[in-house]
């Protein structure tokens, strides 16, 4: 199985900040990388698929980049509603494995 690693498990930022969350695959996944958002109430939403393609209805402040084994999700102009845990998932091969998640919190 392909292992997905998110080295930062939690991240604090201020509203309006630009935040980048990284993800690394144990082998080349040919850009088959998705990003999911899990809100504190448990709601899960697909944000980005195939590295950089924005899912329908997702605000343009979200963007994705990367290639090979290294990928990132960037949130520009952080809003309160973006407070959530973010997971990467590889779709290159079965099983479609997930990273451990990065919890985004507001800096006090």
UniProtKB/Swiss-Prot annotation:
Which cysteines link up through disulfide bonds?
A: 23-88
Q: Which UniProt keywords apply?
A: Adaptive immunity, Disulfide bond, Immunity, Immunoglobulin
Annotated segments matching region Complementarity-determining-3:
89-97
- Annotated region (Framework-3) at 57-88
Q: Write down the superkingdom of origin.
A: Eukaryota
Any one GO cellular component localisation term in the record = immunoglobulin complex
Region (Framework-4) residue ranges read 98-108
Region: Complementarity-determining-2; residue ranges are 50-56
Q: Where is this region: Framework-2?
A: 35-49
Provide the residue span(s) of the region labelled Complementarity-determining-1.
24-34
Q: Where is this region: Framework-1?
A: 1-23
Could you tell me which SMART domains the record lists for this protein? IG, IGv
- Name the PROSITE patterns on file: IG_LIKE (PS50835)
Q: Which InterPro entries match?
A: Ig-like_dom, Ig-like_dom_sf, Ig-like_fold, Ig_sub, Ig_V-set, IgV_Light_Chain
Example GO biological process: immune response
**Database matches in CDD domains:** IgV_L_kappa
- Anything further noted? Anti-arsonate hybridoma protein.
| Protein name per the record | Ig kappa chain V-V region HP R16.7
